[in-house]
A protein has these predicted regions:
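Hydrophobic transmembrane alpha-helix segments characteristic of membrane transport
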Residues: 217-221
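Short helix-to-coil transition segments within interhelical loops
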Residues: 224-230
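Junction motif at the cytosolic side of a transmembrane helix
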Residues: 5-7, 11, 310-314, 381-403
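Central hydrophobic cores of alpha-helical transmembrane segments
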Residues: 21-25, 319-332, 350-351
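Residues that define the loop-to-transmembrane-helix transition and helix capping
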Residues: 18, 231, 318-320
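N-terminal Sec/SRP start-transfer signal
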Residues: 1-23
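Short hydrophobic, aromatic-rich alpha-helical segments embedded in or entering the lipid bilayer
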Residues: 343-364
Length: 403
């Protein structure tokens, strides 16, 4: 334990570590959460001369939007959808531009495009919600089921796989609970979902020197002569790397959640994720989805940390270690679209290379003849990869030190 604390203090004393933590916090929390809520994500846009085209009044807009959504009764039915669309068209006709900003028009418009494609007027430059006849918006859940079936057929998900996904979907409570959706859509679609990708960059910078830095700093001789030996020191370094990963995640996650609670409160936590993507099959509400996404980031970051430390132990050069580490995450993202679909799914299992937004998709894996929903593997396989890298890191470090 003493060695661990020494290594932990040694890591945090480095100026580059403090700079990385600060930059990561500024990017993910200040810009990615606080300013996104208050300014360029939800600020009103009547003043197009302001930065990002938005005003610095996101808090007020969010509260007004939540209050407006509550006026529709809390359940999403045909009548609710008709009322939402009719109300939007009336406000637009009355020139109430500011009032339109508190509506869920982007979400509702996506529903219309998905469920009522025959009502789309290609000659009309306006969005569907502006011109569609509200009286024709019937059969919401029947149409959703039809669209889901068609999507599965087109995706080649038939037979046992289709039935497996239908069994999941049947657990989704209907009618859907409805409150303001746009905030949760942004939160789950980008704010939390992108956290891991950003963390990977800074984890790579910090942890790449954990082992390789000993050669640069000419401390390898000291390690050889210490009474503790390479084995205990290697373990202390690995535990330090994992501890730093958890600490960085905790700093970002706790700060982001506090920001979220300040701006959005808890309103809408029990809405189904189907309000964001209609053909999602997971029986999850917004809170459960957020917990999953944070778990995805944490476990993926731990897995990635294990890989970085293994590379650092095997490679003497800091820069090469960093480049190889970043290639693990960003490489699959760059080449995935050029690979077969099954290969893309396999690459998603690499720590932080996949996406927590798979909860909105219908991807599955077949392992030993058993179908498994992809999000389950996306939070378990990455962390196991990181753990399995530990003995290899120690072995690589040992081989180099003895040489």
């Amino acid at each position: 334990m003493e060695l661990f604390w020494l290594e932990h203090k040694k890591l945090w004393r480095k100026k580059i570590v403090k700079i990385c933590v600060l930059l990561c916090f500024v990017y993910c929390v200040i810009f990615g959460s606080i300013l996104s809520f208050q300014w360029f994500g939800f600020g009103s846009s009547d003043d197009y001369t302001s930065a990002f085209g938005n005003n610095f009044d996101g808090y007020t807009v969010i509260k007004d939007s939540q209050e407006y959504a509550l006026s529709f009764g809390g359940e999403l039915t045909d009548e609710t959808l008709q009322q939402i669309v009719s109300d939007y068209q009336q406000m637009e006709a009355d020139g109430m531009e500011e009032e339109l900003e508190k509506t869920d028009w982007q979400i509702v418009n996506s529903w219309l495009g998905t469920l009522y494609p025959e009502l789309r007027d290609t000659s009309n430059y306006k969005t569907m919600i502006s011109y569609v006849d509200p009286d024709k918006l019937t059969g919401f859940y029947e149409r959703r089921q039809q669209v889901l079936d068609e999507f599965l057929e087109v995706s080649g998900q038939v037979g046992a796989e289709k039935e497996f996904l239908h069994q999941m979907e049947r657990k989704v409570e209907k009618p859907f609970h409805y409150e303001w959706v746009e905030g949760w859509s942004t939160l789950l679609g980008s704010m939390v979902a992108d956290l891991g990708v950003v963390m990977a960059l800074f984890l790579g910078i910090v942890l790449s020197s954990l082992f390789a830095g000993e050669w640069r700093d000419n401390t390898s001789t000291l390690v050889l002569t210490t009474r503790n030996g390479w084995g205990k020191i290697a373990l202390a370094k690995i535990l330090t790397g994992f501890a730093f990963t958890v600490e960085l995640f905790a700093l970002l996650a706790v700060s982001s959640v506090i920001s979220q609670l300040f701006f959005m409160g808890t309103a809408g936590w029990d809405m189904p994720i189907q309000n964001i993507k209609l053909i999602a099959v997971a029986p999850m509400n917004m809170l459960q989805a957020e917990i999953y996404e944070y778990a995805f980031v944490l476990l993926g970051a731990i897995g990635f940390a294990g890989i970085v430390m293994f590379i650092s132990a095997a490679v003497k050069n800091n820069v090469l270690t960093l480049l190889l580490s970043l290639a693990v995450v960003y490489g699959p993202m760059m080449i995935a679209e050029y690979l077969p679909y099954e290969m893309q799914k396999a690459l998603d299992l690499i720590p932080l290379a996949g996406s927590s937004t798979d909860i909105f998709r219908t991807n599955t894996f077949r392992i030993f003849g058993k179908l498994i929903w992809s999000p389950y593997l996306l939070i378990t396989i990455p962390v196991w990869i990181g753990i399995l890298c530990m003995p290899f890191a120690i072995k690589s470090w040992s081989r180099r030190m003895k040489a």
